[in-house]
Amino acid sequence: QGEIIGIIENSGAGKSTFARCLCGLDKKAKGMLEMDGASYDAKQRRHISYMVMQDVNHQLFTEDVLDELLLSMDGEDEKADTARAKEILNSLDLLDKVKLHPMSLSGGEKQRVAIGSAIASGKKILIFDEPTSGLDYRHMLEVSDNLNRLKELGKSLFLITHDPELIYKCCTYLLFIQGSKVLWHRPMDGEAVSLLRAFFSHAQEAGAVNASW
């Protein structure tokens, strides 16, 4: 709880399957998640987790941006929900888009709307699949700031990412998947930074990512 866990992998190593199991969307998932002294099976995890997909076009459903965030909220207090949704949109530089149809936005703007919906949901576990894909550096920083605020609120965040700058800005723990298995996991310390540098240097040489140090 109150952690941002970065999940990195060699391409096709199973991170998306891992994410689907974590949030209870994979029917083959059999394990239990233990958190705060409680255990959650796959069905229970669906009620406490929210996943933002890499292709956010599959999870934008409403007629305008504001309603997209309201859709993920409990709806008990419409006035309070609307105020909170606008606050989130403002933090994501989207307040001027509230009445626009989500599908009319750019790819980066759609990504931020989906992230806003995750924030608005209030779920304990938030899973983001490449949340900065298509975003410029300024908006990456805004996403990072929002993720850090969620961490401070006690949320558990999982970031599937190949963005080293995002990892350095907000991750507190790292998990590396290779061959559909967890090869190593550790806090974001000096050893983790060394392992990250080696991973991204190799990936950059292979042309898989663009990394700056």
At which residue positions do the language-model features occur?
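Helix-to-loop junction immediately C-terminal to a conserved catalytic motif
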Residues: C23
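Conserved ABC ATPase signature
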Residues: H101-L105, E109
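H-loop/switch region of ABC-family ATPase nucleotide-binding domains
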Residues: T161-H162
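A short, surface-exposed alpha-helical micro-motif characterized by mixed small hydrophobic
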Residues: I167-K169
